[in-house]
Amino acid sequence: MASHSGPSTSVLFLFCCLGGWLASHTLPVRLLRPSDDVQKIVEELQSLSKMLLKDVEEEKGVLVSQNYTLPCLSPDAQPPNNIHSPAIRAYLKTIRQLDNKSVIDEIIEHLDKLIFQDAPETNISVPTDTHECKRFILTISQQFSECMDLALKSLTSGAQQATT
């Protein structure tokens, strides 16, 4: 085989290097701007979380517990990747086993769309007492609703900062 050297080889080499450099340096900017799809999913999750909370709050005599905490946002990520979808999904799957509501299936479906990478399944310890189960469901539902409010604010403020 004959080796060709000349201006076309240098240009091709430069083009390949420049393309890789541009791709690696523009990627973080693209991640900071939430796509319309992610924002629509989070808006839908926010609406569904309100429906779930309203449904759960109809149970009289159940109070929120300080014993349960839903991990909401990942501290080391930027919007839209900062929603801790795998952990939230695990909690809602647990709630679905205790109280099978159709809205929970919808929420899990939307959360699946937000999981950008394979994450280990979070293990949730479930209370065994019936009343404590109701407190668990109410507490996690309330925290999930607050989380979606926070996530949507995070997305919209991140989008505004990216445009300025």
UniProtKB/Swiss-Prot annotation:
Q: Name one GO cellular component term.
A: extracellular space
Record has Secreted as a keyword: yes
- List the signal peptide residues: 1-23
Please list the GO terms describing molecular function: cytokine activity; cytokine receptor binding
Q: Which residues are glycosylated?
A: 67, 100
Q: Which Pfam families match?
A: IL31 (PF15209)
Organs and tissues of expression:
Detected at low levels in testis, bone marrow, skeletal muscle, kidney, colon, thymus, small intestine and trachea.
Give compartment(s): Secreted
Write out the entry's keywords from A to Z.
Cytokine, Glycoprotein, Immunity, Secreted, Signal
This entry's comment on induction and repression of expression is:
Up-regulated in skin homing T-cells of patients with atopic dermatitis (AD) and in activated circulating T-cells. Up-regulated in lesional biopsies of patients with allergic contact dermatitis (ACD).
Q: Report whether Methyltransferase shows up as a keyword of the record.
A: no
Organism domain of life: Eukaryota
- Which GO terms fall under biological process for this protein? immune system process
Protein's job: Activates STAT3 and possibly STAT1 and STAT5 through the IL31 heterodimeric receptor composed of IL31RA and OSMR. May function in skin immunity. Enhances myeloid progenitor cell survival in vitro. Induces RETNLA and serum amyloid A protein expression in macrophages.
Q: What is this protein called?
A: Interleukin-31
Q: What is the lineage of its organism?
A: Eukaryota, Metazoa, Chordata, Craniata, Vertebrata
